[in-house]
Amino acid sequence: MSDLDRLASRAAIQDLYSDKLIAVDKRQEGRLASIWWDDAEWTIEGIGTYKGPEGALDLANNVLWPMFHECIHYGTNLRLEFVSADKVNGIGDVLLLGNLVEGNQSILIAAVFTDEYERRDGVWKFSKRNACTNYFTPLAGIHFAPPGIHFAPSGA
């Protein structure tokens, strides 16, 4: 594997990592479905395992999106290990802030993603993701609000 191929692969995988977070936050079905191989597995410990693009959409539409009014993921500490020219293992941390539908309150979730990425016919996608939640903490009495909700404009 050339240095250039390694750098291009790393950039493509970093985009996949971000695309998953953006797709869930912005509720973008097309983006979410496009990042998984048909035989991929996405496991969220305590929830279940979902297979392929259809499984990812099932998880989003029937579990994740109904749970939140809105959410935002912050992905960090992504570390990639090249197993071969076409297979990479990754680990990264995620912090999610969101407003739950149930109880209409805010929540903080910290999780670790352990991933496997594969390149097939020149394209990188997820072949496996395992999400392990470290913290699932409702923030009692707090509801995240957009700017302008709590403060009147100057001179009002």
Curated annotation (Swiss-Prot):
It is found in: Periplasm. Keywords: Detoxification, Lyase, Periplasm. One of its GO terms (cellular component) is periplasmic space. Optimum pH is 7.5. InterPro entries: NTF2-like_dom_sf, SnoaL-like. Its main location: periplasm. The active site is at 25, 73 (proton acceptor). This is Gamma-hexachlorocyclohexane dehydrochlorinase. It comes from Sphingobium indicum (strain DSM 16413 / CCM 7287 / MTCC 6362 / UT26 / NBRC 101211 / UT26S) (Sphingobium japonicum).
